[in-house]
Amino acid sequence: MSSTHPLKDQLALLIEAALEALAPDAPVSLEIERPKNPTHGDFSSNAAMQLARPLKRNPRELAQLIVTELPASTLVAKADIAGAGFINFHLTPAAWHGIVRQVRTAGAQFGRAQRETPQRVLIEFVSANPTGPLHVGHGRQAALGDALCNLYAAQGWDVYREFYYNDAGVQIATLAASVQARARGLQPGDATWPEAAYNGDYIADIARDFLAGKTVKSDDREFTASGDVDDLDSIRQFAVAYLRHEQDLDLRAFAVHFDNYYLESSLYTDGRVDATVQRLVAAGKTYEQDGALWLRTTEYGDDKDRVMKKSDGTYTYFVPDVAYHIAKWERGFARAINIQGTDHHGTIARVRAGLQAASVGIPEGYPDYLLHTMVRVMRGGEEVKISKRAGSYVTLRDLIEWTSKDAVRFFLLSRKADTEYVFDIDLALARNNDNPVYYVQYAHARICRVFEEWSGDVATLADADLAPLEAAHELALMQRLAEYPETVASAARDLAPHLLVHYLQMLAGDFHAWYNAEKFLVADEATKRARLALADATRIVIVNGLALLGVDAPEKM
């Protein structure tokens, strides 16, 4: 057995040594868990119950034999048998003291895993159309994506962050028409205002700068407006560059960066879309019907075959999606994760079907998807739906300006991605323990204040005697610290950053309870140094955890 819990691994070695003495060839997959009832010990193993049948022994008797054969150790204070044959382990205080030392020795590396050969993973997120400001749904996606990138990097993966720009669809033409109408002096509501046009104030801003012949620079392009209201192509290019720049500013304010911006339009100019269609035709996975080209996606689990090329000669949107994911695979990303809204659920089966039909070696189930629901924003007990800037929705920039980057990130990560989230602006602004991000950050600030009052050298705590750490609050805190590496691993594996959010809230709760129950800077030097060492270990884990979420750990609040 190999886990990410330091004490579980040590216990596993003891159990394996006992089993080697009793039944060296017996097959067993060790499972060590934390009992729900703390009176049942710190950890529990069902090893005896697993081996009872192959060894033809009574599980309780076998459990007793395993306990008898356990090597002497400073780790286990007592082991007893419960139920049908569970072995419950009660650890020594020294075992938990070791966690404090591990945390303080590892520092920023505590909770991070190393891989001999890091695997590459591409995580695609946000991927908003360059047709308007980022909304709060994009914000949730940005928070999820950035946190997952950090979590995977912490697990030793070589992480590549990518933003896919849908810059080749009908919506871009609508954007250009909207800006052109504004440039001609039209306004939403006018009789000649284009149908389905974008109405937000940002359209007027783009039109004004276009007429002024301004130059705008986005991540990978710079474009100067012609200023000619009849030059629709110039309007289109300027509007896309303008909004890409605006989205870059939003993401920068949210502390999110990308390694690459992949343009949908490049799939056409590079010939990837045509090549993908030709590959599928050559594989015999297509047919023509009613003047359209169809892909046999039902052969790969889809509920019906899908049109690839319409009778007017244009491609449906899922064709460039297939081409894009083939490009991901060919760039060497054996693992790909897409973070999208739940409204994209229907695309999963057809994209995966297209990838399988292409027969390029892509495994089934590629790519992975993390789907999230939208976000409702509340203020003063009422839902906020309209933003003057966007015209019809609350933007990510609105939310950051109304609250803070840290509050937005922490709140949007605090629930499972597919659970609807209500963002309470009043709660995000509260400076009390009801505000979860304040609660966690305040724990860190409290620790910093203790060390400021102490004014000693933290490095001298390396050899502190931790024997005085024996109170219930101290034990609970040390137990929580030990869970951190396992929490990080689970959050990455399950695509579930909310697990880390919940962990940090519990860790902060354990610390606040200890802080309220005990004084740290006491007269007894040994007790003071031990408590300071535990406080420092707690500080390290809070900082590490918040960093993975992209949230700051202020020293003063």
Swiss-Prot record:
EC number: 6.1.1.19
GO biological process entries: arginyl-tRNA aminoacylation
Cytoplasm in keyword set: yes
Database matches in Gene3D superfamilies: Arginyl tRNA synthetase N-terminal domain, HUPs, Isoleucyl-tRNA Synthetase, Domain 1
Catalytic activities: tRNA(Arg) + L-arginine + ATP = L-arginyl-tRNA(Arg) + AMP + diphosphate
Subcellular compartments: Cytoplasm
Enzyme class: ligase
Protein name from the UniProt record: Arginine--tRNA ligase
Species per Swiss-Prot/TrEMBL record: Thiobacillus denitrificans (strain ATCC 25259 / T1)
